[in-house]
Amino acid sequence: MNLLLISIHYPPFKSSCAVQMRDLAEQFLLEGHSPTVIIPDERIKTKWTKETQNGIKIYRLSSPRISDINFFRRAINEIFLSIFMIKALNKTDLDINSFNGVIWYSPTIFFGPLIWYIKRKSKIKSYLILRDIFPEWTLDLGLMKKGPIYFFLKQWLIFNIMLLIQLEYNQNPI
């Protein structure tokens, strides 16, 4: 199967997300599948770059900065992250219709429009690896109150876009 993996980080980044996605991509490759990884990258100067690591194709798409900046600016940049990634993705040589499924890694809920676009264009199913349940963590941090926006985000952005939920830990039951 041709699988598209979308994440916020991938090696050489040294985050737990990067390591987990690399391990997942390598395991898929070992099992005979063909994984391709897409990540946003604020460091690149072109719309996109393509590389191969251990037999895995990696597309780095130009994006706004989303780390090591103030909270307000990060929120704005993450809101527009999917738009930047869709524009860059459309410039690549990647054939979205060649994939059998897309797997994406949270907590970046702002991948929702990107996943919706890919699913609509290619008619494939998506699977979310859920690290923490959004918008629950925004309640925990006091960034959001339970109200219409909370319920909209919880129902539409997450549960209507993904097909399967995999939890890393059970602190926030569904």
Residue ranges and their predicted role:
Residues 4, 36-37, 127, 166-168:
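A structural signal for isolated positions on well-ordered beta-strands in alpha/beta enzyme cores
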Residues 1-57, 62:
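N-terminal subdomain of nucleotide-sugar transferases
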Residues 82-84, 99-124, 128-131, 136:
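An aromatic- and histidine-rich active-site surface loop
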Residues 92-99:
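Glycine-rich phosphate-binding loop signature in dinucleotide/nucleotide-binding domains
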Residues 8, 66-73, 97, 122-155:
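Acceptor-binding helix/loop patch of EC 2.4 sugar-transfer enzymes
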